[in-house]
Amino acid sequence: MSTTPNIGFISLGCPKNLVDSERILTELRTDGYNIIPSYENADLVIVNTCGFIDSAVQESLEAIGEALEENGKVIVTGCLGAKENQIREVHPKVLEITGPHSYEAVMKHVHKYVPRPERNIYTSLVPAQGVKLTPKHYAYLKISEGCDHRCTFCIIPSMRGDLDSRPIVQVLDEAKRLADSGVKELLIVSQDTSAYALDQSKENQNKTVFWNGVPIKNNLITLCEQLGTLGIWVRLHYVYPYPHVDDLIPLMAQGKILPYLDIPLQHASPKVLKAMKRPGAIDRTLERIKKWREICPELTLRSTFIVGFPGETEEDFQMLLDFLEEAQLDRVGCFKFSPVEGAVATEMADQVSEDVKEERFHRFMQVQQRISAARLQQKVGKTLAVIIDEIDEEGIIGRSMADAPEIDGVVYVDNLSEQEVKVGQVISVSITNADEYDLWGTC
């Protein structure tokens, strides 16, 4: 019988949390622990939680409860871990609780309850890029932690702290390791990607450092330029609409990074945006979108919006629908406002009823589905680069440059056998059909 300790692991939440899970798993593996997908034979279970909205809190609490019931020895980390009292009220038998990105504390607790093995059979087996929970051909790369904004619907800063950017050389080194390991697409994530390095002094931002023998400075534009030298797809997520985002568009037009911008705008009514503490110059946003598309006609714009925010009137909501018609965004996510404990907006007056939220959500989605369908229809007859995600007996599924994994659409590829392509390969596909979300094509 093996004497190697077994650690069960549960990862919940967003891609940023997934990156934290990968970091913890890499350290566990490096220390010689065996990672298993079940509670039954685990010496200890780690639950990496999400606490962004109430439904995520409930999911996390249920996962902790299940781990306690099935195993009994549980360590909790992640965003909900920042609210230790809330967890202990429901689950007092949890061994230890840490907040997000508390890698050293998690490992200290693991060592306390399950001492590291004397003979580490795994060290030589841990890949240079670390343990990854994504398919081998794409990976999330987190460039910073925390956020300096204080949006009234959000509690992320209270859980993850203020902005803390990673050194540019460290980020680029990790990106190169991932590319060298066979990753074909990097998804750049953080709480606020466009704020990268803005937390550092002007002196540090302007200081010249060297990477791969090239002199570089510590800022987002330089980071993207250097990522563009790796010869793989680079996709930006969570880009707050700072003015300097305009400088990214030429890099997309030049093919250095993917022509894809995930930019959460949240609303279009100046009154609602002010209440959210978000940028409110929506006319300026429309002008920027027009300019971006002139510079980079292939640009895909994704955004997210909240309907039913406290104080949102029918007039405010109509402004949002009008904005959708004018902006003609490619991909859109919509969320009904959800009260979150600790968020300023939760205590605001004029809360919108659930019935009205639901009705506005459906009206919003009807408008955007029509827009998305029309924009996808424009791709019929074109030839697109498609990265292959899945190959099975039912067919071949991939994504175009306009599609991020899990949140966007896919491309179904016909008349191609399993023997002709492999997962992670980028192929040219002629688009023959489209609906509101997905494309179909042939090689």
From Swiss-Prot:
Catalyzes the methylthiolation of an aspartic acid residue of ribosomal protein uS12. It holds the Pfam family UPF0004. Residues 5-115 form the MTTase N-terminal domain. Its main location: cytoplasm. Its EC number is 2.8.4.4. One of its GO terms (cellular component) is cytosol. [4Fe-4S] cluster 2 binds at residues 147, 151, 154. InterPro entries: Elp3/MiaA/NifB-like_rSAM (IPR006638), Methylthiotransferase (IPR005839), Methylthiotransferase_CS (IPR020612), Methylthiotransferase_N (IPR013848), Methylthiotransferase_N_sf (IPR038135), NA-bd_OB-fold (IPR012340), Ribosomal_uS12_MeSTrfase_RimO (IPR005840), rSAM (IPR007197). One of its GO terms (biological process) is tRNA modification. It catalyses: L-aspartate(89)-[ribosomal protein uS12]-hydrogen + (sulfur carrier)-SH + AH2 + 2 S-adenosyl-L-methionine = 3-methylsulfanyl-L-aspartate(89)-[ribosomal protein uS12]-hydrogen + (sulfur carrier)-H + 5'-deoxyadenosine + L-methionine + A + S-adenosyl-L-homocysteine + 2 H(+). Its cofactor is [4Fe-4S] cluster. It is an enzyme of class 2 (transferase). Gene3D superfamilies: Methylthiotransferase, N-terminal domain, Nucleic acid-binding proteins, tm_1862 like domain. Residues 133-374 form the Radical SAM core domain. [4Fe-4S] cluster 1 binds at residues 14, 50, 79. SUPFAM superfamilies: Radical SAM enzymes. It is found in: Cytoplasm. This is Ribosomal protein uS12 methylthiotransferase RimO. Residues 377-443 form the TRAM domain. Belongs to the methylthiotransferase family. RimO subfamily. One of its GO terms (molecular function) is metal ion binding.
